[in-house]
Curated annotation (Swiss-Prot):
Top-rank lineage group of the source organism: Bacteria
Ligand binding (L-glutamine): 49-51, 110, 139-140
Pathway: Cofactor biosynthesis; pyridoxal 5'-phosphate biosynthesis
Protein name: Pyridoxal 5'-phosphate synthase subunit PdxT
NCBIfam families: PLP_synth_Pdx2 (TIGR03800)
Similarity comment: family membership: Belongs to the glutaminase PdxT/SNO family.
Record-listed E.C. numbers: 4.3.3.6, 3.5.1.2
Record note on quaternary structure: In the presence of PdxS, forms a dodecamer of heterodimers. Only shows activity in the heterodimer.
Keywords: Glutamine amidotransferase, Hydrolase, Lyase, Pyridoxal phosphate
Function statement: Catalyzes the hydrolysis of glutamine to glutamate and ammonia as part of the biosynthesis of pyridoxal 5'-phosphate. The resulting ammonia molecule is channeled to the active site of PdxS.
PROSITE patterns: PDXT_SNO_1 (PS01236), PDXT_SNO_2 (PS51130)
GO cellular-component term (any): cytosol
Amino acid sequence: MTAPVIGVLALQGDVREHTAALAAAGADARPVRRPGELDLVDGLVIPGGESTTISRLADVFELREPIDKRIADGMPVYGSCAGMIMLASEVLDGRPDQRAFAGIEMTVRRNAFGRQVHSFEAPVSVAGIDGGPFHVLFIRAPWVERVGQGVEVLGTVTEGPAAGRIVAVRQGNLLATSFHPELTGDRRLHAYFADLVRAAV
């Protein structure tokens, strides 16, 4: 089976962790910092970090238009935490100068789960992925307030004060989670995305 070539947007955030998780899931993972590097990948991960910084650096490194075009052309993209914000068609509590790639028809609330001191772990079941719930980590994470037609809700928080909040979605070849699977050692979500990329090539 051919390894899909998956880039990790290497402007800020958990680049090394996503790269290692993708490699463990059987992908040929490589950092993407320039448009020429984006041209060489079959799929892209937008990691956690700070969404306003990622937005600004996407412009500085001249990646915004190439990424927008690849998304429009059907390239699979997975965004975790800040990456989810970068894929949202509408962002609540974002900065006025913040611009997303807007691939998924959803409204997300930035930093919905609170500041870093309010970060927490919780079990989340993700539809289509076997093996039981993920034990996931939320760090200043967004949640999804609304999804449009064609957006599949894959996971919600199952317990605690945030129970019922949407934290994993998919629309076509685009996948987004509020949480950080790259930090937990559970590679199932990266394997799921690698399969999605493999099927799209």
